[in-house]
Each structure stands twice: as C-alpha cells, then as structure tokens.
Amino acid sequence: MREKIRLVSSAKTGHFYTTTKNKREMPNKMEIKKFDPVVRKHVMYKEAKIK
C-alpha cells in the first residue's frame, strides 16, 4: 500500500514536497536531494508525516 508522505527541507526554510511511497519496498525513512526554491539550491529533503 502506498502512503502519502511529506518531504521537508533540511535548510530550515519551511518548504516541503508531498509524494507517496511504498512502505513494503522502502521501510526506512526517505532522504532525497531536491531543489529548494527559497534558498535556490539543491538540498536534502527528509521524510515527515502529513498531519
């Protein structure tokens, strides 16, 4: 089952992306490098729960 997650910027800008992930195939927390438009750089985004 795919679960909705939020990817929060590690640059502490408050920017986030939403996506889905398959919990069975990827049980660990997701970390991915994406573009943060607030600081105009690629930074690490870490998984957080959607409230």
Swiss-Prot record:
InterPro entries hit by this protein: Ribosomal_bL33, Ribosomal_bL33_CS, Ribosomal_bL33_sf, Ribosomal_zn-bd
Ribosomal protein among keywords: yes
Transmembrane residue ranges: none
A GO term, aspect molecular function: structural constituent of ribosome
GO aspect biological process, one term: translation
Top-rank taxon, per record: Bacteria
Pfam families for the chain: Ribosomal_L33 (PF00471)
Keywords of the record: Ribonucleoprotein, Ribosomal protein
Keyword Magnesium: no
A Gene Ontology cellular-component term: cytosolic large ribosomal subunit
Family: Belongs to the bacterial ribosomal protein bL33 family.
NCBIfam families linked to this entry: PRK00595.1 (NF001860), rpmG_bact (TIGR01023)
Entry protein name: Large ribosomal subunit protein bL33
Source organism: Francisella philomiragia subsp. philomiragia (strain ATCC 25017 / CCUG 19701 / FSC 153 / O#319-036)
